[in-house]
């Protein structure tokens, strides 16, 4: 109560502070159950209960007003059973397409800085879009069920005004996307009308029907994205074979000169703002204005708005005296203030500013790795993740909020405090950077050994967080730090798709399609068993390091020809044998090693796992002067 009392002291009771009030209540009551009845589940927080109550109240009020219902007592109390069946609400969802291409389709120049800035910029585009729609409908953040990763779900009133406002909103936003990015980015939206009983899943399946209808509407819009005028406008641009390009993103319009280099306005603005955007230790605010400031760097946003970065003092000045001030956001911290929309949870962990530094700090071979991952069957989890009697909007909202917090904020702690390491002597946080971590989608780059460790930690943390109910599939590619960025993203995405195609998903693919495993198999069999044996035996055997390549080649040949040269394999193992006068302990270790290796080589699954383990071990011991071996 003291938290609420002290925070409310600086809040004025006007509409400008409604989101700040919500922030205070969220901070204080997110982990207090809404019900203390012993015969009820206590899985809905007091915050979510109050937030949804406020959202429904606003929707009901707008519905009553548009339908000229003025006798509230009669409609809501005397005839409440009838009202519960009326389609009072719209569940609206919007989804931005083209996010990945927008983020990754850049040159390797200042790649890490550009990647993280563009990722955060897209997050702000979605936040700005959501807040603009809410403002046009005179609603608040309470009406947001979920927002992140280019997706959003809102609870809106089922009125004609809402439907017309949504149509105008989508047209305005897509027009801005066309004007600024052509067909690269598009937003598709869809909604479904529903009653209170539908949201309570009074009739089994009525709640899941809402989301099926929304998904179908969005799919139809994405199939028919552009009108005839849109297409004519898109085709009106004539490219010149000799026209200049932005050195970062390769676009050929809205160009400017920066330090003698040709850069588009967006990349130039993001570069100037990048330190404020991506530095996790820098306290700043992201201020939205309806007029481009004269003396300050600003980046264009939809709806004729502009993004600039303020210190706390600059923000206070804007709030007080700038007539063009619209709203502001904070990152990973709660604040209150005039039209301070909300804090944005952001996975912003970063250990270095260049890929080359990450490669140099990696163990063994000097390479970076790219991790791409997302939750398996997330859509089905929201629609069918609960038994029918528990499948309600309260639980969907709670699940959405907690998943968003996990991937956008808790992931920073996962990176700062590693649990699993390939290199047991490493210390400190991960040698890596979070490029993008949305509602369920993750992109991490870093030293190859730390990225593999981070992937395992992330999987284990999600399993613990969801009590085993949610799984994640991932792809991890390993590259030189100068490898084209878009190709890194594309190749790692292909590896992720291979994992998604594995039986039961819940998998990770390393290197290429030949190294796809369920997480337990990778951790327990590949690393915990085979990699551990190689490390224990080979680390004290100089001959073993050079013979590993020959053993690896022999196993590969077995796979390709379905034949194993037993004599050759026995010869290679024999070369690892200790001298006749070696201690008994060393002889026993060798005998165990050779027997186990001989057993593994004759079994398809074990042989496959052994190949991956050898890859990992060779990478760990590879020295700079023989990386080309």
Located regions from the model:
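Charged, helix-rich terminal subdomains or tails
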Residues: 1-150, 154-629
């Amino acid at each position: 109560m003291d938290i609420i009392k002290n925070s409310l002291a600086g809040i004025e009771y006007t509409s400008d502070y409604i989101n700040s009030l919500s922030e205070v209540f969220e901070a204080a009551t997110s982990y207090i159950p809404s019900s203390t009845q012993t015969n009820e589940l206590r899985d809905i927080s007091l915050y979510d209960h109050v937030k949804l109550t406020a959202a429904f109240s606003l929707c009901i009020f707008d519905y009553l007003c548009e339908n000229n219902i003025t006798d509230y007592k009669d409609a809501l109390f005397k005839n409440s059973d009838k009202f519960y069946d009326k389609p009072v609400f719209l569940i609206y969802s919007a989804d931005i397409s083209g996010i990945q291409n927008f983020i990754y389709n850049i040159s390797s120049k200042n790649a890490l800085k550009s990647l993280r800035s563009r990722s955060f910029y897209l997050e702000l585009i979605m936040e700005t879009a959501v807040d603009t729609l809410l403002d046009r409908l005179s609603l608040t953040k309470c009406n947001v069920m979920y927002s992140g990763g280019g997706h959003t779900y809102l609870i809106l009133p089922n009125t004609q005004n809402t439907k017309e406002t949504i149509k105008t909103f989508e047209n305005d936003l897509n027009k801005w996307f066309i004007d600024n990015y052509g067909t690269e980015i598009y937003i598709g939206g869809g909604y479904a009308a529903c009653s209170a009983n539908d949201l309570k899943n009074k009739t089994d399946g009525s709640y899941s029907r809402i989301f099926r209808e929304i998904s179908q509407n969005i799919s139809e819009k994405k199939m028919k994205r552009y009108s005839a005028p849109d297409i004519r406008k898109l085709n009106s641009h004539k490219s010149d074979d000799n026209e200049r390009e932005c050195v970062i993103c390769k676009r050929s319009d809205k160009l400017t000169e920066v330090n003698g280099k040709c850069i588009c306005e967006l990349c130039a603005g993001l570069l100037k703002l990048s330190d404020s955007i991506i530095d996790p230790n820098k306290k700043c605010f992201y201020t939205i204005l309806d007029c481009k400031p004269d003396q300050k760097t600003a980046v264009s946003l939809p709806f004729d708005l502009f993004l600039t970065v303020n210190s706390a003092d600059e923000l206070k000045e804007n709030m007080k005296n700038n007539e063009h001030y619209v709203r502001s956001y904070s990152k990973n911290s709660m604040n209150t203030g005039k039209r301070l929309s909300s804090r944005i949870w952001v996975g912003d962990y970063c250990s270095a500013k260049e890929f080359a530094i990450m490669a140099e700090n990696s163990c063994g071979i000097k390479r970076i790795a790219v991790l791409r991952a997302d939750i398996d069957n997330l859509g089905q989890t929201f629609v069918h993740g609960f038994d029918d009697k528990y499948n309600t909007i309260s639980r969907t909202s709670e699940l959405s909020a907690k998943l968003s917090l996990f991937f956008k904020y808790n992931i920073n702690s996962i990176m700062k405090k590693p649990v699993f390491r390939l290199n047991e002597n490493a210390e400190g946080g991960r040698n890596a950077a979070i490029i993008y971590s949305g509602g369920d989608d993750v992109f991490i780059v870093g030293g190859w050994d730390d990225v593999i460790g981070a992937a395992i930690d992330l999987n284990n943390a999600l399993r613990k967080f969801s009590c085993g109910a949610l799984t994640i599939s991932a792809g991890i590619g390993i590259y030189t730090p100068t490898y084209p960025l878009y190709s890194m993203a594309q190749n790692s995405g292909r590896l992720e798709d291979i994992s998604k195609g594995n039986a039961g998903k819940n998998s990770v693919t390393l290197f290429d399609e030949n190294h796809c495993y369920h997480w337990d198999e990778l951790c327990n069999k590949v690393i915990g068993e085979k990699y551990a044996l190689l490390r224990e035996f080979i680390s004290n055997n100089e001959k073993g390091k050079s013979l590993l390549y020959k053993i690896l080649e022999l196993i590969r040949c077995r796979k390709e020809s379905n034949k194993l040269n037993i004599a050759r394999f026995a010869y290679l193992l024999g070369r690892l044998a200790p001298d006749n006068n070696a201690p008994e302990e060393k002889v026993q270790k060798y005998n165990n090693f050779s027997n186990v290796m001989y057993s593994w080589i004759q079994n398809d699954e074990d042989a496959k796992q052994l190949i991956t383990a050898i890859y990992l071990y060779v990478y760990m011991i590879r020295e700079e002067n023989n990386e080309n071996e």
